[in-house]
């Protein structure tokens, strides 16, 4: 749609008269002001992405050469936020730039880009973020086109605590080069505490881009680009984020597994009254938790520290115990932590572990930090500041939102499975899950923010059918989906596949699902209970046994949604889906994999995995 199709001639003339009087900085300010107005109107038919440009944007061929394409591949929002910052800096520098998420960009056209800046995080065991999977598979296929005309820059985010640090970015970087693209700047790999390094990187990138693209955008060129923008509806956003969370309050917490269950799962409701916080089905809730004081003082005693020592964190002085409660990850051990402690302590157990990566990884996954100090001898006193520098910075935990805002109003719901296990007779718990279930009380304050997930959205057309596949707490977003579909009076059919341990103990939200089924809103439900018989039954088995009908739904346009564990459940479910299409769609396995990749591109196959 062109501007002429949106504004009358009189409106366009009045707008041009005003714009001609504005400086570049005034235009930049105005663009942000107008974006805010658009985002505050939920009923508008026109909107833009958070970057200020539209999704699905295609530039005319004569504009591509002098346009910087910024693509972000994000799992929890970090890469996307950096891309937005860079985009703003490029525009402020007078450069023509367009921002996309990896899921928005028509990846087969990537070889036509003149200047590409690619910013990605790493997910799981070195995989790219979910929204970048289709692009990743295309680039590493024989179908990928050469990229000789493309100059590129890659920024890769990761966590040095893990074996596959920044691997997704490294993979993209090497593949761009293998396809003939020209490196404009060496890849930069950043750890979890990245902001200061990001600022330096952005400054360098803007300088390089200004040198690469001599022509600075004029007002006329700005108008030409706007003529190519396709506007789309966008829901409102708020200013709450990881750095500036909302203070919410716990309204209700209810255990939703039986007392006999091997799992301890709870439904939590938070009060967000008056905050203006908005969310959609499919979004995630970020929660800043606090460590257990008992765990903190157990660790301090093992290290002969009092907790009253002064330490520096984020340029602030505070007592060590406060820093450990609020700013350090005490529950997840990592190879980097073990290596640091081994170097200082010279403990033989840890030094031997460093010689075998597999044994080191196994030790980290089974031995929490505090348990490690029970097992080793410290030949040197660890200082309070050394401890702070060794431990990973605390990061928020993310939970799939289990409510539709149009149903629950100024509340937000999540589903939490508490991590509990015993080591050497001592009970250990997960940091965030035990905080939410064991330590937070009704009406206590919780620091939260919404992480938008445009890669896990209901179909825009309510007449389209959906298939929901979840295991354990992976059922949470489907509760929000069904609340929304019921309110929308969606005519599309709904089919739920759900798996857990036992029917009598672990059927999460059972009454709600039965109510939806009896009312006809939920058309089909297939459950898999892995411990209810001598042999294991999982959701992927149910997919295979319902393969013919599943294929029929897919052929009729159904959207497929998967939520659950990334390492096992999501992998096995995808293999089952590939098998179903191969058998009932009369395809070989390669063709079936291509089919699901195309389903991803069409946003008909979406996953929320963790």
Curated annotation (Swiss-Prot):
Associated pathway: Sulfur metabolism; hydrogen sulfide biosynthesis; hydrogen sulfide from sulfite (NADPH route): step 1/1
Cofactor(s) this protein cannot do without: FAD; FMN
Complexes and interactors: Alpha(8)-beta(8). The alpha component is a flavoprotein, the beta component is a hemoprotein.
EC number: 1.8.1.2
Domain spans labelled FAD-binding FR-type: 243-459
Listed NCBIfam families: cysJ (TIGR01931)
Keyword line: Amino-acid biosynthesis, Cysteine biosynthesis, Electron transport, FAD, Flavoprotein, FMN, NADP, Oxidoreductase, Transport
An MF annotation (GO) of this entry: flavin adenine dinucleotide binding
Residues in Flavodoxin-like domain copies: 68-206
Lineage, top ranks: Bacteria, Pseudomonadati, Pseudomonadota, Gammaproteobacteria, Enterobacterales
Keyword Endoplasmic reticulum: no
Binding locations of NADP(+): 530-531, 536-540, 572
Protein name per the record: Sulfite reductase [NADPH] flavoprotein alpha-component
Residues binding FAD, per UniProt: 331, 365, 397-400, 415-417, 421, 430-433, 610
Cofactor: binding comment: Binds 1 FAD per subunit. Binds 1 FMN per subunit.
Positions that bind FMN: 74-79, 121-124, 157-166
């Amino acid at each position: 749609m062109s501007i002429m199709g949106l504004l009358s001639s009189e409106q366009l003339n009045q707008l041009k008269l005003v714009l001609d009087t504005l400086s570049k900085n005034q235009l930049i300010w105005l663009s942000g002001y107008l974006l805010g107005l658009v985002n505050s109107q939920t009923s508008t038919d026109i909107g833009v992405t958070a970057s200020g440009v539209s999704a699905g944007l295609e530039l005319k061929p004569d504009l591509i050469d002098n346009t910087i394409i910024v693509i972000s591949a994000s799992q929890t929002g970090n890469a996307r936020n950096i891309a937005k910052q860079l985009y703003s800096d490029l525009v402020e520098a007078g450069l023509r730039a367009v921002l996309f998420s990896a899921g928005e960009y028509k990846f087969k056209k990537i070889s036509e880009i003149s200047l590409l800046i690619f910013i990605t995080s790493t997910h799981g065991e070195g995989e790219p973020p979910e929204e970048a999977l289709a692009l990743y598979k295309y680039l590493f296929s024989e179908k990928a086109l050469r990229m000789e005309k493309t100059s590129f820059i890659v920024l890769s985010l990761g966590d040095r605590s893990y074996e596959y640090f920044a691997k997704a970015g490294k993979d993209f970087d090497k593949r761009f080069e293998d396809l003939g693209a020209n490196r404009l700047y060496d890849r930069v790999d950043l750890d979890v505490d990245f902001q200061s390094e990001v600022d330096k990187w952005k400054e360098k990138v803007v300088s390089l881009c200004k040198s690469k693209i001599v022509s600075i955008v004029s007002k006329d060129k700005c108008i030409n680009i706007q003529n190519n923008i396709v506007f789309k509806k966008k829901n409102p956003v708020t200013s709450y984020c990881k750095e500036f969370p909302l203070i919410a309050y716990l309204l209700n917490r209810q255990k939703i597994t039986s007392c006999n269950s091997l799992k301890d799962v709870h439904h939590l409701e938070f009060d967000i009254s008056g905050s203006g916080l908005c969310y959609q089905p499919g979004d995630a809730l970020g929660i800043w938790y606090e460590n257990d004081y008992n765990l903190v003082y157990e660790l301090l005693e093992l290290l002969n520290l009092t907790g009253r020592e002064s330490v520096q964190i984020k340029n602030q002085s505070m007592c060590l115990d406060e820093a450990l409660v609020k700013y350090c990850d005490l529950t997840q051990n990592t190879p980097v932590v073990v290596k640091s402690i081994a170097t200082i302590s010279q403990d033989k157990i840890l030094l031997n572990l460093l010689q075998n990566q597999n044994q080191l990884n196994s030790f980290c996954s089974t031995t929490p930090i505090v348990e490690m100090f029970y097992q080793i001898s410290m030949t040197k006193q660890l200082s309070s500041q050394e401890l702070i520098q060794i431990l990973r910075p605390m990061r928020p935990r993310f939970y799939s939102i289990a409510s539709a805002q149009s149903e629950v109003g100024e509340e937000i719901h999540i589903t939490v499975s508490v991590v509990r296990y015993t080591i050497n007779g001592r009970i250990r718990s997960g940091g965030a899950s035990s905080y939410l279930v064991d330590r937070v009380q009704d009406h206590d304050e919780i620091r939260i923010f919404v992480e938008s997930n445009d890669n896990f959205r209901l179909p825009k057309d309510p007449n389209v059918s959906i298939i929901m596949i979840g295991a354990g707490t992976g059922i949470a977003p489907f509760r929000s989906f069904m609340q929304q579909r019921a309110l929308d009076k969606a005519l599309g059919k709904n089919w739920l596949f759900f798996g857990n341990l036992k029917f009598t103990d672990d059927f999460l939200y059972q009454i709600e699902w039965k109510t939806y089924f009896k009312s006809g809103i939920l058309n089909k439900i297939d459950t898999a209970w892995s411990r209810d018989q001598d042999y294991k039954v999982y959701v992927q088995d149910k997919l295979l046994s319902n393969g013919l009908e599943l294929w029929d739904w897919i052929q009729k346009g159904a959207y497929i949604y998967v939520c659950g564990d990334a390492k096992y459940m999501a992998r096995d479910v995808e293999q089952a889906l590939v098998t179903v299409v191969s058998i009932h769609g009369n395809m070989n396995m390669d063709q079936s994999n291509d089919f699901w990749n195309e389903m991803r591109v069409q946003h008909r196959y979406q996953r929320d995995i963790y």
